Regions:
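FNR/FR-type flavoprotein reductase catalytic core
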Residues: 3, 77-231
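Ferredoxin-reductase
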Residues: 2-90, 145-146
Length: 231
């Protein structure tokens, strides 16, 4: 592959293992000029024999930073995610694309609602950091199989409090006071049906379809935007 201006050279600065599936990667990217919350970039791996593999990942970092971060979920037989999780080291070189996509960006005209499953929280990490800096309100609903999958749980719980709703569906820790059920209409009883919202949903295809079904029954004044794994 001959790279165009679409891709830039990048150096891995930091790698943080979260659990047996998730990790954060932070890169320094040449000519990085920031992004709009909700955009993604493509990460390219190049083998010694010239073989290349490219995968898209939502940008999880604050838009104003001169570095860019991604939340990586290790997928069974995932060519890129397995390498990034298992073998990448600080100092490694990659190619990372300029920010892509305007379909799932933060509009911030009405009150945002973020609905995520698992690593689908990634674009909302960027969006929420931006909104917190602007001191603007938003709601976050996050479903995870375990406590470690609730990325930034302590920070969210401290800062957002009544606007943050975490759910654990499998490995429920002792003393857990959050939700334990899968997504249903009752989870959103705290929303004011007379207020306008912009709703963002990110997760697996089955989760997004279920969330759309639930939201459609709430009769909210809202615009809905979706992002699905692999789409």
């Amino acid at each position: 592959m001959t790279f165009t201006q679409h891709f830039n050279s990048a150096t891995l600065l930091k790698k943080k293992i979260i659990d047996d599936k998730l990790c954060f990667l932070e890169f320094k990217v040449e000519n990085w000029k920031g992004h709009i919350p909700g955009q993604y970039s493509e990460i390219c791996l190049t083998a010694e024999n010239g073989y290349q593999a490219i995968r898209p990942y939502s940008i999880a970092s604050t838009p104003q930073k001169d570095t860019v971060s991604f939340l990586i979920e290790k997928i069974d037989e995932g060519e890129v995610s397995n390498f990034l999780y298992d073998y990448s080291l600080a100092g490694d070189k990659f190619q990372i694309s300029n920010p892509i996509g305007l379909r799932f960006i933060l509009h911030n005209i009405k009150t945002p609602i973020f609905i995520a499953s698992g690593s689908g929280i990634a674009p909302f990490l960027s969006m929420s950091k931006y909104l917190q800096e602007k001191k603007l309100s938003f709601f976050t609903y996050h479903w995870s199989r375990n406590i470690t999958g609730l990325i930034n749980f302590d920070e969210y719980f401290l800062r957002l409090n009544k606007y943050y709703f975490p759910f654990i569906t499998r490995e429920i820790p002792v003393g857990w006071k959050g939700g334990i059920e899968r997504i249903k209409e009752e989870n959103f009883n705290n929303l004011d049906i007379n207020q306008g919202y912009e709703i963002y949903i990110c997760g697996s295809d089955s989760f997004v379809e279920k969330a759309l079904s639930v939201i459609s029954n709430l009769s909210l004044d809202s615009e809905i935007y979706t992002e699905r794994f692999g789409s």
